[in-house]
């Protein structure tokens, strides 16, 4: 899913885990820079609204999800002299539902504000978010090293491989 936005994309993406229930409650879990590399979980509400088509809206504040749309300065970028006051990361909390097959094998979303595509895929029932994210982080550390400033470097034995344009926003 390409994007035609000329804005400069940054970062390599953030993994969020979500558990939606039929009562319009959603549990969101994450462990990344926006949670200061600690596991964070919050529960809020969701709804599907109509706005030139179906839109998934996170209609109440969620500490995990709304960290991406909060227009505050990011404290962990201050050392680099960056100031995001007024824009933050520029993330969304309302998403156009681009594709949602009847078999629920995935859902493709597009942020209403930024236009970034997001893919939702189901996890197995009963997966504990905190444990799952710990396993992902353990694998990432094994493959990409610990305390590496640029996560676009793959370590294989003594060899290091750098990925060019790994975060250009185009899948």
Task: Please place each PLM-identified region on the residue numbering.
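Lipid interaction determinants
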Residues: 1-41, 51-171
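Conserved hydrophobic positions within beta-strands
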Residues: 46-48
């Amino acid at each position: 899913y390409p994007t035609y936005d000329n804005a400069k994309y940054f970062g390599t993406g953030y993994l969020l885990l979500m558990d939606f229930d039929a009562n319009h409650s959603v549990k969101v879990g994450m462990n990344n820079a926006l949670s200061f590399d600690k596991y964070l979980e919050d529960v809020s509400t969701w709804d599907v609204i109509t706005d030139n088509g179906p839109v998934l809206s996170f209609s109440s504040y969620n500490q995990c999800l709304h960290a991406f749309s909060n227009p505050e300065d990011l404290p962990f970028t201050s050392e680099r002299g960056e100031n995001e006051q007024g824009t933050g990361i520029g993330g969304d909390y309302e998403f156009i539902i681009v594709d949602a097959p009847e078999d629920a094998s995935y859902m493709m979303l597009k942020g209403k504000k930024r236009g970034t595509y997001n893919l939702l895929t189901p996890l197995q029932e009963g997966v504990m978010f905190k444990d799952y994210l710990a396993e992902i982080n353990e694998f990432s550390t094994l493959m990409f090293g610990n305390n590496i400033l640029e996560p676009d470097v793959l370590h294989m034995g003594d060899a290091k491989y750098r990925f060019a344009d790994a975060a250009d926003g185009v899948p």
